Amino acid sequence: MSTVAVVKPISQPQVADLRIERATTDVRRFAMLLIPLGLLLATFKVYNLEQPAFFKLACIVFAGFAVSYWLPFRHKEPFLIVLSLGGAYFLLGLMVASLLIAAGLLIFGIVRSGIEFRWRILLLVGVLAVCVYGRASGRFPVPGDLWPVLGAMFMFRMIIYLYDLKHQSGPASLKDFFTYFFILPNYYFLLFPVIDFQTFRRGYFQRNIHTVAQQGVWWIFRGTTHLLLYRFIYQLQGRFTPPNVAVATAVTIKIVSCYLLYLRVSGQFHIIAGMLCLFGYDMPETNHRYFLARSINDLWRRMNIYWKDFMIKIVYFPAYFKLRRSGMLRAEIVGTILVVVTTYFLHVYQFFWLKGSLRFSLNDALFWSILGSLMIVNVWIEYKTRGRAPRSGRPVRLRQAAQIVATFAFMALLWSMWSADSLTEWFYFLKSGNI
């Protein structure tokens, strides 16, 4: 008999996927989610919120949530992909949806190819150049509705996707690609928040589905109130024009109401994030009490949080970490300048995809120059006051209130200038109260 012992390998215990537990269903809690969604759907219908296609989108999303909720966890994302692709055909039509999917598969094929990363980037730049030519010339035999949707899907998120892909170890996943780019609300909302790829993937069922979905319901409700307020302000401002009111009154109301119309953007962003939450994606807040900002930099952090995070990740941090050895203040100022300049040109790029033409105007240049200059001043002030103990008391609260009022008033004036077609038109408005 052999005395050699046979050593069996010890099997490692499998790590349980906590997301499966977080996707556990509950009839009562499901009903508590479905009831407010039904009320929101009724509100959309009664008040004709947005365009007719929005109601169709909401029906698809809410019905999709009702089905996805009861599916086993492993089937949830495949179902969402099928729902999103089918929704493209329903909302955009056969030709546009088919071309979008074909473009997506072409892009993924390049990304997934085994060639060096720099050559993949070069191929994607070539695809971009062809699309830019098609958008600018209109000579391709494709529907004109294709280009704005294609741009809204890929123009910014592709930058983040490639950045994260370069820094990850594994290959690109087709499932991750489709869930990230073919987001159902994006077919309707062309002005879309720049969702971070890592945040999007990391947030998938990172908390209990009922908690995340309830947050989504709340954000959809908040976005709905923003859109209703936007409609009210938009309709109201036309009543305050000379000779019905004094010129000074008309100018003041128009300036304030023009700034308040940003409620439409924040309302749409809240609804988009809320819809994603229904399917388990724990999305961060898109906007946070931006009318209560105490400075320009505070406003930058609050007004479009996803864009701020996008710029910090792609522009600010790379510049900051390269320059910080030459001085922290210098690194922060240069990083801020690069962020403002990049934001300006990316807004021009966005306008091209949505409208089909480049927009360089004196209003835009002045807006971003003034905003950037004040942001640099704020960076310097924050740097000099860093480390000081925070103060409290009534004088501090009064000063903070004054800062909020001053920031709001200044941004309202600057926003009215930015919204005018030209400086001549803006000066005429300030003089006459008419625009």
Language-model features, listed with the residues they occupy:
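Membrane-embedded transmembrane alpha-helical bundles that form the catalytic cores
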Residues: 2-435
